């Protein structure tokens, strides 16, 4: 997208708008879209066009029984619906969870496989099913939006070249977030592999950033944006209809 290049935004187009097809009114003025220089400005045009019924994107989801059609990402309806309730930081597994109100949580971990140092991302876990994913790039984009530090992107190279410093950093997380003592940490050291180090390092760094936020409202806004982005409903996303 041209606007992405102008604003230097790295975003999956399906997270911006997951529409599978578009209905366009005859004579629609595409100049309204072409003239926009910012993502928020483009999103405003998309929303106005949807409300005018001149340009409508529709996302198709698997339907069971009946079907429902609903509008998504209409700005006036995007009130805060999730708040931060804490985190879960396992003593043994490579993942960590950001906990949100309503029983929702975002699991962050590497999904690249047992021997891979790639694929770190978050996945929204709801009461009934997984509800979307957010990779490290968009996670850092949202952190930057709030003026916060980002999760370093050098985890793989650090694991390969300096695993001792990686383990030392994770050990701080194990003591702070998992409440482990030194004997427990030393015992765990012999049981983990490179993939575990790669994943747990970034989990530790992300939770550290979130926990360092003292302003409760800011923290709530941040985690909700992570949740909304993963479920294609963030302020970076544009309006569409969802048929399911």
Predicted feature descriptions by range:
Residues 1-244:
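Short, positively charged
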